[in-house]
Amino acid sequence: MITLENVNKIYSNNLHAVKDVNLKVNEGDIFGIIGLSGAGKSSLIRLINRLEEPTSGKIFINGENILNLNKTELLERRKKIGMIFQHFNLLSSRTVEENVAFALEIANWNKKDIGKRVSELLEIVGLSDKAKYYPSQLSGGQKQRVSIARALANNPDILLSDEATSALDPKTTKSILELIKEIQQKFSLTVLMITHQMEVVKEICNKVAIMSDGRIVEQGGVHHIFAEPKNEITKELISYVHQQTDTELNYLHHKGKKIIKVKFLGTSTQEPIISKVIKEYGIDISVFGGTIDKLATMNIGHLYLELDGDLAAQTKAIEFMQTMDVIVEVIYNGD
């Protein structure tokens, strides 16, 4: 659906915002691109519909290199790419229905069809009763719903989201993500989401790429990235989700007792593994606590354990667990 090959963006001030990016987004993906501020995320997404022009590289949508399109061809292709923004980009002098209609007007829809289409779109986003309101009369979440309705106006195949929830409170963020997921399924959209919020990735994405200093440093299925992050930036972003639990463990170090985090993907269960380890290696295991990451693709369970007994036996027990269908991370080595 969307393929980027060796894409670079260098601005006139010599800022190299996007560096040799290679990315593939398949049809039907809800693909998240996450990174800290200044990582190059927003620059990257604006290249996909050529709001910004890349300095070099190739960008394919449905097998067509959009960099070869002339202005007329590009405008036609853009009708199939909807986009929503952090600050909504609504026209303050237009009502809700007029803001949505604007997207149809510039796409040269027949005037007699615009009213019906606007009504359909407002019903989809739950704002039929706000059609005559102005943006100043709406909450942040309602404004973003108008933005989503406008983005859907021309029946797009692709929806681009540039930090669409970062200005919203957690409750409103959840409702907007639920709406995006609903319309993605209903209209078979491919969604590309820029965010700095790992919670957004957890809630809705099936795949994710992590950006740092203009480069994609890691990418893959969300559950794989959460379970076994490789890059230090990825580990840092994920650590924010588990910050409280991991911080509490720093106060529980006891000499001679290793502390481990055991991660269980999907339906794998922990009890048989733990009981087998206790019997096989003659050690005691205390459970400090656990968390569950409820991802869009599957759940990942995190169990925090303290091992007690002969250190060599503890080490062998960990090595045994690493051969099972779990991921083991040593948090404290008992030294």
From Swiss-Prot:
Transport is among the record's keywords: yes
Pfam families the record matches: ABC_tran, NIL
Record keywords, A-Z: Amino-acid transport, ATP-binding, Cell inner membrane, Cell membrane, Membrane, Nucleotide-binding, Translocase, Transport
InterPro entries reported for this sequence: AAA+_ATPase (IPR003593), ABC_transporter-like_ATP-bd (IPR003439), ABC_transporter-like_CS (IPR017871), ACT-like_dom_sf (IPR045865), MetN_ABC (IPR041701), MetN_ABC_transporter-like (IPR050086), NIL_domain (IPR018449), P-loop_NTPase (IPR027417)
Residues that bind ATP: 35-42
GO molecular function, one term: ATP binding
Quaternary data: The complex is composed of two ATP-binding proteins (MetN), two transmembrane proteins (MetI) and a solute-binding protein (MetQ).
Name of the protein in its database record: Methionine import ATP-binding protein MetN
Species: Fusobacterium nucleatum subsp. nucleatum (strain ATCC 25586 / DSM 15643 / BCRC 10681 / CIP 101130 / JCM 8532 / KCTC 2640 / LMG 13131 / VPI 4355)
Organism placement in taxonomy: Bacteria, Fusobacteriati, Fusobacteriota, Fusobacteriia, Fusobacteriales
